[in-house]
């Protein structure tokens, strides 16, 4: 995540994000409310994978939407129903105002650790571009991250997709994803972030900007795999093949299980 001088421990708190989105530099007071910012990758970079995995008729949930252009760009490309949530009431009001004429977009202030407003199996696709990473910087990490993922699993319809765009390598993120008792089938794609590596990968190949990587049986990168760009972004496409097995005792046990993060 972009750090600047901010304390990463603030990333799980509404107060931090409210202050951030009230700043003129992010389109808040004094800035005309017109600012947009995309963590990691833009829609144009993600479009091939999104269009391949997510039909335009899907019911989509955007986690931690912030003031990203991703949802707007998806609607321009034919997506019909995107619910955007964020812990910051400030940015939600900003985005409601900006997109008041776009009927395909809905905005709600909601904490991803408790999305009980929505019923089980409400969404075909849930997109997370940096939100899990922010949760792992919160005061209640990794417990808060687990609660978020449990909610994601609950909200997904069988056959649905959770698309996680993150800086987290498989050793960290797949271990975290596997704590959820949902039958995930995970595909991993790696996108170089540094321009020099993007150019090296091009060579006219259709997959130049996104490489699908076969994971080992235990869900890790192959031992001989060489990560070309150390600043790469990882995209985990998690398919839900069955209904989550509810076990409330898991929540209390996750802190010990994930204490290595």
What are the functions of these language-model segments?
Residues 158-166:
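Conserved beta-strand signature within the Rossmann-like core of class I S-adenosyl-L-methionine
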Residues 113-126:
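A short acidic, Gly/Pro-enriched loop at the edge of an enzyme's catalytic core
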Residues 7-10, 26-47:
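Conserved SAM-binding loop and adjacent beta-strand
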Residues 36-58, 69, 73:
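Conserved alpha-helix/loop element of class I SAM-dependent methyltransferases that forms part
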Residues 200-261:
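Core SAM-dependent methyltransferase catalytic element
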Residues 142-158:
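A short glycine-rich, Lys/Arg-flanked "PGG" loop and its adjoining helix->strand segment in the class I
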Residues 59-115, 150:
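Class I SAM-dependent methyltransferase SAM/SAH-binding core
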Residues 146-150, 170-214:
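Conserved Class I S-adenosyl-L-methionine
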């Amino acid at each position: 995540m972009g750090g600047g001088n901010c304390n990463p421990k603030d990333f799980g708190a509404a107060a931090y994000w409210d202050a951030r989105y009230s700043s003129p530099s992010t389109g808040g007071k004094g800035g005309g409310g017109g600012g947009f910012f995309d963590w990691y990758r833009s829609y144009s970079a993600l479009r091939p994978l999104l269009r391949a995995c997510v039909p335009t008729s899907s019911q989509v949930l955007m986690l931690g939407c912030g003031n990203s252009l991703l949802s707007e760009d998806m609607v321009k490309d034919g997506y019909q129903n995107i619910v955007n949530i964020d812990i910051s009431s400030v940015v939600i009001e900003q985005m409601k105002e900006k997109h008041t004429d776009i009927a395909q977009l809905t905005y709600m202030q909601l904490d991803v650790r408790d999305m009980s407003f929505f019923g089980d199996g409400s969404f075909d696709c849930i997109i997370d571009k940096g939100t899990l990473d922010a949760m792992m910087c919160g005061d209640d990490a990794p417990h808060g991250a687990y609660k978020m993922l449990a909610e994601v699993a609950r909200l997904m319809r069988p056959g649905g997709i959770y698309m996680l765009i993150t800086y987290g390598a498989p050793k960290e993120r797949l271990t975290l994803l596997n704590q959820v008792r949902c039958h995930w089938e995970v595909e991993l794609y790696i996108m170089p972030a540094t321009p020099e590596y993007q150019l090296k990968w091009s060579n006219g190949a259709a997959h130049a900007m996104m490489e699908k990587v076969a994971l080992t049986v235990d869900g890790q990168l192959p031992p001989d795999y060489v990560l070309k760009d150390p600043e790469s972004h990882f995209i985990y496409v998690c398919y839900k093949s069955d209904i989550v097995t509810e076990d409330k005792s898991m929540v209390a046990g996750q802190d010990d299980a994930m204490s290595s993060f």
